[in-house]
UniProtKB/Swiss-Prot annotation:
NCBIfam families from the UniProt entry: cysS
Cellular compartment(s): Cytoplasm
Keywords, comma-separated and alphabetical: Aminoacyl-tRNA synthetase, ATP-binding, Cytoplasm, Ligase, Metal-binding, Nucleotide-binding, Protein biosynthesis, Zinc
Record-level Gene Ontology MF annotations: ATP binding; cysteine-tRNA ligase activity; zinc ion binding
Residue positions binding ATP: 274
Entry-linked InterPro entries: Cys-tRNA-ligase (IPR015803), Cys-tRNA-synt_Ia_DALR (IPR015273), Cys-tRNA/MSH_ligase (IPR024909), Rossmann-like_a/b/a_fold (IPR014729), tRNA-synt_1_cat_dom (IPR032678), tRNAsynth_Ia_anticodon-bd (IPR009080)
Native source organism of the sequence: Pyrobaculum neutrophilum (strain DSM 2338 / JCM 9278 / NBRC 100436 / V24Sta)
Short motif 'KMSKS' region, span: 271-275
Annotated cofactor note: Binds 1 zinc ion per subunit.
Record's keyword annotation contains Electron transport: no
Upper taxonomic lineage: Archaea, Thermoproteota, Thermoprotei, Thermoproteales, Thermoproteaceae
Protein's UniProt name: Cysteine--tRNA ligase
Protein family according to the UniProt entry: Belongs to the class-I aminoacyl-tRNA synthetase family.
EC supergroup of this enzyme: ligase
Cofactors, names only: Zn(2+)
Amino acid sequence: MRIYNTATRQVEEFTTYVPRLARGYVCGITPYDHMHVGHGRVYVFFDIFRRYLERLGYEVRLVINFTDIDDKIVNKAREEFGHEAYKRWREVPERYIAEYFEMTRRLYIKPAYAYPKVTENVEDMVKWISTLVEKGYAYVAPDGSVYFEVAKVPNYGVLSRQKIEELIAGARVEPEPGKRNPLDFALWKSWTPGEPWWNSPWCPGRPGWHLECVVMSTKHLGAPFDFHGGGADLIFPHHENEIAIARAYFGVDNFARYWIHVGYLTVRGEKMSKSLGNIITLREVLSKHSGEALRLAYAMSHYRKPMEFTYELLQQAEDMAKTLYTAYDELSQALRDAGEKDQEPIAQEALKYAGAFYGALDDDMSTPEAVQQLYGMARYIISTVLHRVEKISRETALAVLNKYVEMADVLGVLERRQIPKELEEAVKALVETRARLRQERQYQLADYIRQRLAELGVELHDFGPRTYYTYRRA
């Protein structure tokens, strides 16, 4: 498999430091507000990436953090709790972390290897800062804040392809009080009255954002690890500063081999923002559409390119999901009608879609092409395999079904394919009754059963004397 590496600006062969073990870190949310569809795009992509690595035989250790203390959280607590914010601020991240797990469950995102929180790792962060100060890469400001000195790190700007001189020119003419350079960033922020704080050798306060991710990722994955990911908006300054910190601490050029970034999501051509009032939350979308439809909608755009979000796209994805389920449901039933041996090369044609599907994912995770191959296989199953299933053996038909499900599992769709046994047995009995009525030419009664089943979300499709059915998933 080949993947684009932001650090080198090239599509590279994916290899890992430890054979068959892929260790990765994706920057998680700052839990101060509802998750939006931009968040969903990032985490669905890395879920598909993780699923594909597992299909290739890797054990995947994916770590996703929660930045559960931040200025935004403090401000939200003040808005909600007023003078009690100092006591109740933890309620804010707890609420939105719970929402994160609800939304990712509804998006069929597999659980991460670990979910570290900043507040549970402050002691480790203080130790890191002490080491950086001792090595001369960080300095203590008069108010007790600690800053990382960017000028001490060679090749700063390597990830974002920016030169330090140009960055300084684009920054403020005068650095903030306590800073030696406008580009220097906080490793430790001194306490402000009314805000949460932790003890440190320098002053009461809390850690800085860029430090947090380096400490938590390497704590769980070691250094160097295989891939580090997030949204494209994190390339600078966040990921650039992570690299600088790790270079100073470990003395290595890069503490992650591949840097993988997901493109922006836009609404009516503009990036989502509160100021524009165009934020679309995951809760809003998932109240109207299935998680699988949203996964397909995301996958229809290449992860590195901007994605325009529309409800028309979601409806298209919903229709596609319905077709995928129809192919699965009906081929599952058609196994009983398969022949004893293969008389036509129907299966070989079906399995060509699988080759193209995996070829697309091997080529920098080209999910738009992979989606089209899965959808193409579904249509081929419906248009050809079901009509001529008696021309292939049961083993061959089962091989087609298994390969189809395997492909769907990589994209995280067909997750609702299991139907309660009682419901399936009841539907099967009604379908058999309808088949007898058709043989007896009692078409009015047969149509009545079809109609009633449709009202219950069961669609019947006749293939000559055979009838297969599909369920409408809620």
